[in-house]
Amino acid sequence: MATPANQNGRITQVIGAVVDVQFEGHLPAILNAIETKNGNNRLVLEVAQHLGESTVRTIAMDTTEGLVRGQEVTDTGSPIMVPVGLGTLGRIMNVIGEPVDEQGPVANEGLRPIHAEAPLYTDQSTEAEILVTGIKVVDLLAPYAKGGKIGLFGGAGVGKTVLIQELINNVAKAHGGYSVFAGVGERTREGNDLYHEFIESGVNKKGGGEGSKCALVYGQMNEPPGARARVALSGLTVAEHFRDQGQDVLFFVDNIFRFTQAGSEVSALLGRIPSAVGYQPTLATDMGALQERITTTHKGSITSVQAIYVPADDLTDPAPATSFAHLDATTVLNRAISEKGIYPAVDPLDSTSRMLSPLIVGEEHYQTARMVQQVLQKYKSLQDIIAILGMDELSEEDKIAVARARKIERFLSQPFFVAEIFTGSPGKFVDLADTIKGFRAICEGKYDHLPEAAFYMVGTIEEAVEKGKKLAAEAA
């Protein structure tokens, strides 16, 4: 179908990822997708600003090398549209919904715009049910909510991606519904590994179709900022469609910080004056527009797990600080813990969850979690004294508390299924009842006779006892 002449414009200026386009007698709406050809590729530009009466400033969703001034551009009349529905399962798409897995076109149940309003208050629903992950430190101290938003905070190289992959392994594989994974500005190698791992483990079938349970939407590190700033929305659109069909969807994002970072790269090119630490002035608005759409309605639920990179390990940086407000549970990864060789390197005193209430998790779970935190807090407060005067100067009571805290620290570690190839020890999924029983027994001193090493990298407390016997036999 030929487009009306006035819907065609011409490129007047190209500045990196930002392209200015002039139209005659027609101005595309903000957020509209406009298209042009770049070599043999379809290049989508998204309208970001109106400059004067006839020119729009757009953000390119792909590289702009090869574009020339005067080149013709067409207004599509709608925002970027991505395929949704069962055909997306088992497939990898990019930000504009094109397949990138070389398995042919994506069969879809229609197209949906990536920009949408958040559900109304009256449509939203909240559930107070726990999502059991099989990871001891998470289930005990900062349990996740079904249909909630979960953030994994951590600096570079402390294990966010490994933790998110373990959650996919433990939750998505056992989960009856569908999952969507949005790879935002992370390593292409990890995205590729995840795709093949899903096929090997039976979560997805090669080429998608019947039997596949996870859709993948990637805009990785090598993509221009426009793609990285929008790919989270493309993934969310696929997840929203499943939710509106009555499904319980798992939505994984790795990494939400790259969404902010891409926004800040584009913001400067659009001529906006930067705010604190050089971020875009619209940081809170951009984050809110994304996060408010990730919600559970009366039709279905979206449980989202988001990895959030913390620049220079500073949790007060505007990017992680803005995301804190939107989350139901935060899992904070700490470099000091990873340096001790304790993985997952989750900070038991810094991680929080609104689910840790006796009304939701029950009295026993709540009391055990608080006992564990109390012992660890006491150890933390004694560390200065230990560093200066040594353990001998502590009272008997404090010595016992420190010994228990060190055992708890090690018992919070756990071998992961996805890390088997690196560690050589098989992964462990620990039931919530076993987790509570084990930590309660350590706090009550039932295992004071076991050495610290017995608690390191085991699943249940029974395994720790076995390991203790083995260590004693080796020592003898």
UniProtKB/Swiss-Prot annotation:
It is a peripheral membrane protein. Disulfide bonds: none annotated. F-type ATPases have 2 components, CF(1) - the catalytic core - and CF(0) - the membrane proton channel. CF(1) has five subunits: alpha(3), beta(3), gamma(1), delta(1), epsilon(1). CF(0) has four main subunits: a(1), b(1), b'(1) and c(9-12). The keyword Cell cycle does not apply. It is an enzyme of class 7 (translocase). SMART domains: AAA. Belongs to the ATPase alpha/beta chains family. It catalyses: ATP + H2O + 4 H(+)(in) = ADP + phosphate + 5 H(+)(out). CDD domains: ATP-synt_F1_beta_C, ATP-synt_F1_beta_N, F1-ATPase_beta_CD. Keywords: ATP synthesis, ATP-binding, Cell inner membrane, Cell membrane, CF(1), Hydrogen ion transport, Ion transport, Membrane, Nucleotide-binding, Translocase, Transport. Pfam families: ATP-synt_ab (PF00006), ATP-synt_ab_N (PF02874), ATP-synt_VA_C (PF22919). The gene is atpD. This is ATP synthase subunit beta. The lineage of its organism: Bacteria, Pseudomonadati, Pseudomonadota, Alphaproteobacteria, Hyphomicrobiales. It comes from the Bacteria. It is found in: Cell inner membrane. Its EC number is 7.1.2.2. ATP binds at residues 154-161. GO terms for cellular component: plasma membrane; proton-transporting ATP synthase complex. One of its GO terms (molecular function) is ATP hydrolysis activity. NCBIfam families: atpD. Produces ATP from ADP in the presence of a proton gradient across the membrane. The catalytic sites are hosted primarily by the beta subunits.
